[in-house]
Amino acid sequence: MALLQISEPGLSAAPHQRRLAAGIDLGTTNSLVATVRSGQAETLADHEGRHLLPSVVHYQQQGHSVGYDARTNAALDTANTISSVKRLMGRSLADIQQRYPHLPYQFQASENGLPMIETAAGLLNPVRVSADILKALAARATEALAGELDGVVITVPAYFDDAQRQGTKDAARLAGLHVLRLLNEPTAAAIAYGLDSGQEGVIAVYDLGGGTFDISILRLSRGVFEVLATGGDSALGGDDFDHLLADYIREQAGIPDRSDNRVQRELLDAAIAAKIALSYADSVTVNVAGWQGEISREQFNELIAPLVKRTLLACRRALKDAGVEADEVLEVVMVGGSTRVPLVRERVGEFFGRPPLTSIDPDKVVAIGAAIQADILVGNKPDSEMLLLDVIPLSLGLETMGGLVEKVIPRNTTIPVARAQDFTTFKDGQTAMSIHVMQGERELVQDCRSLARFALRGIPALPAGGAHIRVTFQVDADGLLSVTAMEKSTGVEASIQVKPSYGLTDSEIASMIKDSMSYAEQDVKARMLAEQKVEAARVLESLHGALAADAALLSAAERQVIDDAAAHLSEVAQGDDVDAIEQAIKNVDKQTQDFAARRMDQSVRRALKGHSVDEV
């Protein structure tokens, strides 16, 4: 397996000259910015000493505010205060309305179906909102470092798809930032812990943030970080704990009107405060909307237990994908503020059979890892031997004849990666080829996900199988896919970059993987049948062309035998008997052997006509 050296040519800094770089943890609930100073990675605080920046933006006609100031307006001006925008990244409006029906914002759809949020500052998309958060973080870094940033590394959940990753990059560019790389959040945490403590072996990174959950199984060895498998849920996090507790408080308080956005915000604020308090106390008193009551940690644990169980199921799947057992995991790294919840730490410890690591602040560990990576990529550590491997979550491939999927890059392949396969034409004189890019684990197109289509035109008109088309799949370090098709004799090519308008949920990814295992035997049989049908069609197509050109080489009796064999093959190819189709193909081959030999002799005679033996 190839390893990726994380240092780019041309970026090495001059002696005694350091470039300014930052790592940004663009979180659902809170965001942070970190940098490396005097050889140590540290998060940067605001003027009041606060390291976290709430991922909240409040919009007004004359401007906007970000962070704590914006969050104070959430209850007063809910419609213009955008929070948890990370959940909206790369999703269509229909998808958002289905997933998050209780959002207090008014939406409109853009021409391509993407969401536009109605605010006092006008219609804004999630990319713009994210850009405003990034600008605030960049301003903090610029002031702390007394200079403009040369580049940033921004972290994203491991399960972010192409559209979500591209949206993050677009937001950074809109904020005026040079993106060195997008980095998976669990991988960033592994960098922070791997470099600080020099561990080797298999570790699990359990990342439960405000809005997303990721589990990564990594192997650390001599500065090499290899992601063995990933899993998670992009719609599960501490926010869900908050909403469950808010609903519980609402029921206890007898507050019926859920549509009152202001009351809902007060309930949510009370729930957040109670959750934090219950991490350190056995019970907490809650005051909201004129109601006062007490909530115990036991009650809170009962509410969130099903969600914690969901995270552990994802852990089990990731371990299976990685091919390791829980007792092989040497350490468990806890990432994200929600891992402070005692029940989470307790259940994770029980699952892996060891207390999880919490020596680095779980809120800061991702930003610290991103800062270390940014410092290397910007050229401040040209001698670094650190390597980093990420993986793709689902296999990538192409549709081939018969509705089959030919996998080009298997799932859990490390990225960046480039793989190529050669394909050919099916029919005589074929001058174009449709390239259908697929994603999934099943054998048939109907059971996989369509990513993109494009056409390669200008193929030389040759007999079937005469043209050779090389299709190259390239996944870059940010997980974005480019597909290029090139006809090898002419050099004509076409390509596409996959940027779906919205992506799969993590539960859908898990379901696709599960289905591939459940239907493995059935899929293999279906593939064998489809392949035989394609071969039958190819044989009949070739035979039809040969008869049209050289039927005169056959006697009437010989022609009848061949026609009967072809008719039988055509008939059985409509059925589902793989063996019968295979035998019928062999019979056609047998009955046409003499015909093929005569055609070859005739071609040779034509080629030699008019030439002497000496010329040959």
Swiss-Prot record:
UniProt xrefs under InterPro entries: ATPase_NBD, Heat_shock_70_CS, HscA_NBD, HSP70_C_sf, HSP70_peptide-bd_sf, Hsp_70_fam, ISC_FeS_clus_asmbl_HscA
The organism's place on the tree of life at top rank: Bacteria
Keywords associated with the record: ATP-binding, Chaperone, Nucleotide-binding
First and last residue of the signal peptide: none
GO biological process entries: iron-sulfur cluster assembly
Key word Chaperone present: yes
Pfam families membership: HSP70
Keyword match Cell cycle: no
GO molecular function annotations of the record: ATP binding; ATP hydrolysis activity; ATP-dependent protein folding chaperone; unfolded protein binding
Role according to the record: Chaperone involved in the maturation of iron-sulfur cluster-containing proteins. Has a low intrinsic ATPase activity which is markedly stimulated by HscB. Involved in the maturation of IscU.
Family classification: Belongs to the heat shock protein 70 family.
NCBIfam families referenced in this protein's UniProt entry, alphabetically: HscA, PRK05183.1
Descriptive protein name: Chaperone protein HscA
Naturally occurring in which organism (per UniProt): Escherichia coli O139:H28 (strain E24377A / ETEC)
The gene coding this protein: hscA
